[in-house]
């Protein structure tokens, strides 16, 4: 799985866990709807660190908490 795939998977996981809509995440993170759609559709090939910061903040967590999942372990990722 690519890093971007892992980010999308983590977003979906957290949306379910927190019973949060994508719209609410967009509002709380400051990420525009079009950009979020681009990420969630897999069309975005590079999710920047600043976007991950915004996502984590939107979920009310730190970046470390956002990335605290086995899907982000090096051996589980296709790193270019």
What are these regions (language model features)?
Residues 43-57:
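Short, basic-rich loop-to-helix N-cap that marks the start of a DNA-contacting helix
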Residues 15, 26, 56:
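The alpha-helix within a helix-turn-helix
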Residues 1-20:
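A short, Lys/Arg-rich alpha-helix, primarily the initiator
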Residues 13, 67-80:
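Short, charged recognition helix plus adjacent turn
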Residues 12, 23, 53:
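Residues within the helices of the helix-turn-helix
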Residues 31-46:
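Recognition helix of helix-turn-helix/homeodomain-like DNA-binding domains
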């Amino acid at each position: 799985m690519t890093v971007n795939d892992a980010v999308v998977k983590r977003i979906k996981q957290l949306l379910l866990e927190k019973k949060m809509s994508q719209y609410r995440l967009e509002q709380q993170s400051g990420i525009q709807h079009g950009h979020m759609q681009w990420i969630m559709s897999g069309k975005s090939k590079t999710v920047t660190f600043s976007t991950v910061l915004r996502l984590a903040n939107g979920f009310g967590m730190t970046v470390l908490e956002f990335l605290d999942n086995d899907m982000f372990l090096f051996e589980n990722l296709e790193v270019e």
